[in-house]
């Protein structure tokens, strides 16, 4: 009985298993049905795609999505396999392929689908009728205006035996291969069944892991007509991108233009290269040329910047009442993206550009007609944008078309070379009015570019404008929990409230940040002799060896400061620089110590040496056409910068002396807050800790990179923070006990009057000034969220950053080295008879034999290998290191002598008799007073400008109303009402206001 039950149970299991197997093998044609997770496609009728060209190859593909139909049967032998016929129901159905030429089909950003990442159509059935490959892009495009010629033939790089075989390595699914070589132990197979040979050969081993549903692109040899001897291609955009574009009425929307540039950027226009804005139906004038420079930033930083730029273009196109902008304002804007090095650019950034239609893989060449390609230029007018979340935004979100020029430099030659491509190549070709510079990672506000442009439109003397850079605080402002981010946020805010407005009033801003700034292209041009701002600006790229002294080399680390000075000091011109507070851009600041130190090393060295250069060459200002009051203001600004330079140079000693005198005051037993000489012990410990950390900073900075000594630098910052915290405590304690003594609350505690006054005035000129200016500009929140972190980390700014910067003056790199190696990974395009482009390879066996014979001769003759001489780069590095040693030694000795001399003359208990401490504290007061005057003046001028603009708009409205009234009433009666009875009181009042405004305009000489 038990045996019969086991047999029946086993038979039932076998039938159930057979039913499941037959259920899997049964094929059901796909019919789209609505489900909660995936609604029915809203496309309706699928557009008919033209049949493929003869050069395409029908390669079946499998979808790996869940729920896709599976193979209905598996052959037991490879040799007797035949393709099963397609069911009639499948042959008549329409579907969307799971891939497009081997690439996964992306989500559609059309408004009809809401930007959903899901495919809008159902996947293709596993076995389809002939013609299921109609989604392939036709390779042969017969057209008179197409630069591609006919006669192309497909190249099979892998030399597969059969592209139609389902056993091919590139098409077979891993699960099926495993099923063919495994035996299901749960199945009772009969002995007559034959197993598939597990050692069957499927072709060569793949070079990399293959992905399901992905087909590698097939290359073909084509004949291409050269234009002026250069390789210029018009390539169709991907079909899926073309399918949802709102506009397809012009070639700039349907084709991407590729140009292989084989010349130097200075010779771009002379060699006859032209951009789309110079030819055909796309010939246009360029008002704004936007430069976005990038190195190895990822796709998140790139999309933040690019999406912000496209939002600004949308805003410019929405200004329908503007004389310059409007619905077609995008035609006056060109976005130029320059990548510094093809091998350095982030692959996913290229993917993002490809998604926009700007970039296509596999069309670039290393060599054209035996000339090395220096830059690959891609041009396309995109109609979609990618936001930082990598979601498509199109016309449904207000995105306007954007003319994109993507320059992919073949070699990594640093940022200055990228700017040379921008100004000397593309700028000369397009002749824009305004050039805007952006860094990848900076997100401009939706109206930032308009406000920058408006500054030039309102004042013809403005040659450059700087926007307000804000530090990124992260989601929910959680980044402020990091003291490094909080301190930088405070620093950026106070610079935009105090420093930039002051410099804008003078007319010379020391630095227009490369992250968000603008220049008038005409003002940048050199004179007839080749001298001018751009000539001086690009000198830093060609300096080598001892010809580039260390001062000049470090000065060009802050290349944006060079342009600022050269513009203001341009001979026989009267250009000024302006700060535009309404042009806001947000950038990510370093949140780790190594990145922070490396960034500030370049900034500090560049700022220091550029300030020295501007002070030494201050006499150039008298050769300009600035008015006399303007020249006087610029000289005053030069004196202010000189004072700042002195404080920077002796910042190390001044910090130690301030700590020595203020913290040393608590060593007196009368005012010791702790008692039992604890104040004296704390002072001695912190004093020696300060000296020890300073000495260690020199050793670490001259021998270690921040990335390799992160803990050492972190330890130094912590010690400096403790010292600063104790110094602040001592300062507040001295002020409190003096106030108590003066009010009579506690007469036993009293400090000298001089020390009290000095401390109070210094506090008012720093903390008080910061609060006043922040509330004046209605932006005080950083005082409550970031000021504490800034004051605690202030010694690290003075000591750690300055020591590392001066100890690395020999390092004049941007963190990258020039790349001059010729890569041939893209192949070479060789011109034959002036028309045909072919790939270079040995033509006959004789060529291979000749190369082999030459190698044998060199081995037989033992040709002496010459010694490698000392390279120019090594000589340059040795020279810079020697100058670094001398400079650091002089700087360190000067600070030590000052600190030792003052500490010997005045003891820690000198109090009010310490003249040097009084000079330091009152100097802080004077510098702060200059900053607050400049900041207040800028705020007043800003209010006056807004009032004048409002008055102008109000008068224009009244004039329009008066014209309307006079036109609608009777002619003679209207004239009598207007002119009869004398002048009205309203006219007299308007004339008086006009006269007052004219007098005020003459008085504001600083705006000339």
UniProtKB/Swiss-Prot annotation:
GO terms for cellular component: cell septum; cellular bud neck; plasma membrane. Residues 10-19 have a biased composition (Low complexity). Keywords: Cell membrane, Glycoprotein, Glycosyltransferase, Membrane, Transferase, Transmembrane, Transmembrane helix. Residues 1-160 are annotated as: Disordered. InterPro entries: Chitin_synth, Chitin_synth_fun, Chitin_synth_N, Nucleotide-diphossugar_trans. Disruption phenotype: Exhibits lower chitin content, reduced growth under the stresses of cell wall-disturbing and oxidative agents, more released protoplasts, a thicker conidial wall, decreased production of amylases, pectinases, cellulases, and malic acid, and increased citric acid production. Reduces drastically spore production. Residues 34-45 have a biased composition (Polar residues). Signal peptide: none annotated. One of its GO terms (biological process) is mitotic actomyosin contractile ring contraction. This is Chitin synthase C. It comes from Aspergillus niger (strain ATCC MYA-4892 / CBS 513.88 / FGSC A1513). The lineage of its organism: Eukaryota, Fungi, Dikarya, Ascomycota, Pezizomycotina. The gene is chsC.
């Amino acid at each position: 009985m038990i045996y019969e039950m086991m047999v029946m149970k086993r038979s039932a299991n076998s039938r159930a298993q057979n039913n499941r197997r037959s259920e899997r093998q049964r094929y059901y044609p796909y019919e789209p049905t609505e489900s909660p997770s995936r609604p029915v496609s809203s496309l309706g009728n699928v557009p008919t795609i033209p049949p493929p060209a003869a050069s395409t190859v029908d390669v079946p593909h499998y979808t790996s999505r869940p729920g896709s139909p599976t193979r209905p049967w598996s052959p037991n032998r490879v040799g007797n396999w035949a393709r099963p016929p397609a069911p009639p129901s499948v042959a008549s159905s329409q579907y969307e392929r799971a891939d497009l030429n081997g690439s996964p089909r992306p989500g559609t950003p059309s408004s009809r689908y809401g930007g959903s990442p899901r495919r809008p159509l159902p996947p293709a059935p596993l076995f389809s009728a002939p013609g299921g490959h109609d989604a392939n892009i036709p390779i042969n495009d017969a057209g008179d205006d197409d630069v591609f010629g006919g006669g192309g033939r497909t190249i099979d790089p892998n030399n597969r035996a059969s592209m139609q075989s389902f056993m091919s390595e590139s098409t077979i699914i891993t699960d099926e291969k495993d099923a063919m070589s495994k035996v299901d132990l749960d199945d009772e197979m009969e002995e007559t069944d034959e197993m598939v040979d597990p050692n069957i050969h499927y072709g060569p081993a793949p070079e990399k892991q293959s992905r399901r549903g992905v087909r590698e692109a097939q290359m073909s040899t084509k004949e291409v007509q050269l234009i002026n001897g250069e390789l210029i291609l018009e390539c169709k955009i991907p079909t899926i991108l073309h399918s949802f574009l709102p506009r397809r009425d012009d070639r700039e929307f349907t084709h991407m233009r590729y140009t292989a540039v084989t010349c130097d950027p200075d010779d771009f226009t002379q060699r006859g290269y032209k951009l789309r804005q110079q030819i055909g139906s796309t010939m246009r004038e360029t008002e704004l040329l936007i430069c976005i420079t990038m190195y190895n930033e990822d796709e998140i930083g790139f999309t933040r910047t690019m999406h912000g730029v496209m939002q600004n273009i949308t805003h410019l196109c929405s200004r329908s009442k503007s004389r310059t902008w409007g619905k077609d304002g995008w035609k006056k804007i060109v976005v130029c993206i320059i990548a510094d090095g093809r091998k350095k650019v982030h692959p996913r950034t290229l993917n993002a550009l490809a998604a926009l239609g700007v970039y296509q893989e596999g069309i670039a060449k290393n060599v054209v007609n035996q000339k090395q390609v220096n830059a690959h230029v891609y041009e396309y007018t995109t109609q979609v944008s990618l936001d930082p979340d990598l979601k498509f935004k199109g016309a449904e979100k207000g995105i306007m078309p954007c003319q994109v020029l993507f320059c992919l430099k073949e070699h990594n030659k640093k940022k200055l070379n990228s700017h040379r491509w921008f100004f000397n190549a593309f700028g000369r070709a397009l002749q824009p009015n305004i050039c805007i510079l952006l860094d990848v990672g900076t997100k401009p506000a939706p109206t930032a570019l308009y406000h920058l442009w408006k500054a030039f439109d309102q004042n013809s003397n403005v040659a450059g404008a700087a926007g307000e850079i804000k530090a990124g605080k992260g989601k929910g402002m959680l980044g402020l929990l990091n003291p490094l981010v909080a301190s930088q946020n405070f620093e950026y805010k106070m610079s935009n409230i105090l420093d930039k407005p002051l410099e804008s009033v003078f007319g010379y801003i020391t630095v227009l940040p490369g992250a968000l700034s603008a220049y008038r292209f005409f003002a940048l041009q050199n004179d007839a002799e080749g001298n001018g701002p751009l000539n001086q600006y690009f000198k830093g790229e060609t300096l080598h060896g001892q010809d580039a002294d260390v001062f000049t080399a470090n000065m060009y680390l802050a290349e944006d400061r060079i342009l600022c000075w050269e513009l203001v000091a341009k001979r026989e011109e009267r250009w000024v620089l302006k700060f535009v507070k309404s042009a806001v851009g947000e950038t990510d600041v370093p949140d780790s110590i190594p990145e922070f130190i490396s960034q500030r090393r370049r900034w500090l060295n560049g700022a220091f040496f550029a300030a020295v250069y501007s002070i030494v060459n201050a006499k150039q200002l008298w050769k300009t056409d600035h008015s006399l009051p303007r020249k006087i203001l610029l000289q005053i600004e030069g004196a202010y910068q000189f004072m700042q330079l002195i404080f920077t140079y002796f910042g190390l000693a001044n910090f130690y002396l301030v700590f020595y005198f203020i913290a040393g005051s608590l060593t007196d037993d009368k005012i010791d807050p702790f008692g039992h000489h604890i104040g004296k012990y704390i002072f001695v410990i912190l004093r020696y800790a300060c000296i020890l950390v300073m000495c260690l900073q020199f050793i670490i900075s001259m021998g270690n990179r921040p990335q390799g000594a992160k803990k050492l630098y972190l330890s130094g910052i912590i010690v400096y923070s403790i010292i600063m915290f104790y110094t602040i405590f001592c300062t507040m304690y001295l002020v409190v006990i003096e106030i108590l003594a003066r009010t009579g609350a506690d007469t036993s505690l009293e400090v000298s009057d001089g020390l009290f006054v000095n401390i109070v005035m210094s506090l008012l000129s720093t903390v008080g000034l910061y609060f006043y200016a922040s509330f004046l500009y209605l932006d005080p929140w950083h005082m409550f969220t970031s000021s504490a972190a800034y004051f605690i980390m202030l010694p690290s700014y003075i000591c750690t950053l300055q020591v590392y910067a001066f100890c690395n003056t020999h390092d004049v790199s941007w963190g990258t080295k020039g790349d001059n190696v010729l890569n041939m990974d893209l192949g070479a395009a060789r011109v034959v008879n002036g028309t045909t482009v072919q790939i270079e390879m040995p033509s006959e066996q004789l060529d291979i034999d000749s190369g082999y014979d030459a190698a044998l001769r060199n081995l037989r003759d033992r040709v002496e290998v010459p010694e490698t001489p000392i390279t120019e780069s090594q000589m340059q590095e040795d020279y810079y290191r020697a100058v670094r040693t001398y400079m650091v030694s002089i700087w360190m000795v000067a600070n030590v002598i000052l600190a030792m001399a003052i500490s010997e003359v005045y003891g820690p208990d000198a109090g009010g008799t310490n003249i040097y401490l009084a000079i330091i504290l009152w100097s802080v007061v004077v510098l702060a007073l200059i900053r607050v005057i400049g900041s207040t003046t800028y705020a007043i001028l800003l209010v006056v400008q807004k009032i004048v603009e409002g008055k102008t708009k109000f008068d224009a409205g009244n004039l329009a109303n008066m014209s309307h009234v006079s036109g609608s009433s009777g002619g003679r009666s209207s004239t009598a009402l207007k002119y009869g009875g004398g002048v009205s009181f309203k006219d007299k009042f308007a004339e008086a206001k006009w006269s007052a405004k004219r007098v005020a305009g003459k008085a504001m000489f600083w705006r000339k």
